[in-house]
Amino acid sequence: MTLRLRSFFAAAALTACTLAQAQAQTWPAKPVKIVVPYPPGGAVDVVTRKMAAALQAQTGQSFFVENKAGATGTIGMAAVAQAAPDGYTLGANDTTWALLPHIFRKLPFDHAHDLVPVSAYVFAPMALVVKADAKYRTLGELVTAGKAGADKVTYGTGGAGTTPHFASEAFGIAAGANFMHVPYKGAGEATMALLSGQIDFQFASTPGVMGQVKGGKLRLLAVSGSRRAAALPEVPTFAEAGVKYAGLINFTGLWAPKGTPAAVIERLQKEIAVAMASPEMKAFAEGIASEPGVWDAATFSRDLAERTVFWGKVAANTAFERQ
């Protein structure tokens, strides 16, 4: 390679680096859309709206949420994958993302490459909730009823193939009980069905139900995790309640289209970290019985890979057929 060519490539690399830095410094220069691939009212929607408000306050630029639900979140995430990779369209999701390869034979995007994990935050236990005046006062009573007769005890979710669906199935297997699944169009709709007495229980991430719990309308029988949630010291874990089922701690996270400048992603990660360190976001997380942590992209990617394997094992032990 001639000296002239070396100088050219060096200058090109320097220019690219300078442009990337400039993008990070000027981003966001216009409103940022965050696609929530589920209906309003669920955990992802609740947490994402709070994060969007925090990012808007920090940057002085508009961050707005667009609900684009359908097909277990794939419609909304496909829209994000097809968006311009400029940092102005992001996608929000939870551990359901790791389920997608196990519930669909073919996805409308490349699950492993078309979307880049940015950061995860607000870590929430999965909780088994019943109506406040439900006849089941303990998890043991619910399990006993489930063992007594197949399909007599019902549970609702935001749809077949969602995290609560698989979490409920895994719980039933661990408990040796039979429960009938009733799918709804979104977690919020399932919660309304629970409140009206149409179903017996619901598996939900705590952000989506704590409002009703605090209002005395719903009651928690158990939470996932190896220890009790700090904000719910009176609620036992599943193991403490007699079922050897640890479950998973859920999260809310953001993804960006493949090709989004690294400098923009790094800026977004920093803004998210600043938001989660604020007293307001910490109080918000604790108020919905969650932990106010934050993961960088590397930790997030590693966890997603582990969850994908975990959900694959759960799917293999259920009667669910890939769509």
Each predicted region: which residue ranges?
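A ligand-binding cleft/hinge motif common to bilobed small-molecule-binding domains
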Residues: 96-106, 170-174, 201-235, 312
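C-terminal lobe and pocket-closing loops
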Residues: 123, 209-277, 309, 321-323
